């Protein structure tokens, strides 16, 4: 039975970027070294190797990444709250374009 087409809702480009997990911070920091150590590994294989290495880390070794994840979560929650407040107030969520800002400044 064919699926019904999902309605394509336009995503607001000004929506705050989601927070990253501790593992994502670890992956970003270690992917290049892992790629150098395993030059023939595919993207998926690198992901598996990174996951395996992540599981081997002690809680002490994970702490810097966990802290970055906590800070990023706080950033996301703060930005999301500001974004939602602007939406609720009917304000535009984007920044004014340079020509519009220049025109507004010129009128003053």
From Swiss-Prot:
Q: Basic and acidic residues compositional bias: what residue ranges?
A: 61-85
Q: Which Gene3D superfamilies match?
A: High mobility group box domain
Q: Which InterPro entries match?
A: HMG_box_dom, HMG_box_dom_sf, HMGB
Q: Where is this region: Disordered?
A: 1-20, 61-108
* Any one cellular-component term (Gene Ontology): chromatin
Ranges in coiled-coil conformation: none
Segments of the chain annotated as binding DNA: 16-84
Question: Which keywords label this protein?
Answer: Chromosome, DNA damage, DNA repair, DNA-binding, Nucleus, Transcription, Transcription regulation
Q: Which PROSITE patterns match?
A: HMG_BOX_2 (PS50118)
Biased segments, Low complexity type: 96-108
* Chief subcellular location: nucleus
Disulfide bridge positions per record: none
Instruction: Give the GO biological process terms.
Output: chromatin remodeling; DNA repair
Molecular function terms, GO-annotated:
DNA binding
Q: How does it assemble?
A: Weakly associates with the stable spt16-pob3 heterodimer to form the FACT complex.
Q: Which family does it belong to?
A: Belongs to the NHP6 family.
Q: What does this protein do?
A: DNA-binding protein that induces severe bending of DNA. Required for DNA-binding by the FACT complex, a general chromatin factor that acts to reorganize nucleosomes. The FACT complex is involved in multiple processes that require DNA as a template such as mRNA elongation, DNA replication and DNA repair. Also augments the fidelity of transcription by RNA polymerase III independently of any role in the FACT complex.
* PANTHER family from the UniProt entry: HIGH MOBILITY GROUP PROTEIN DSP1, MITOCHONDRIAL TRANSCRIPTION FACTOR A, ISOFORM B
State the name under which the record lists this protein. Answer: Non-histone chromosomal protein 6
This protein's gene is called nhp6
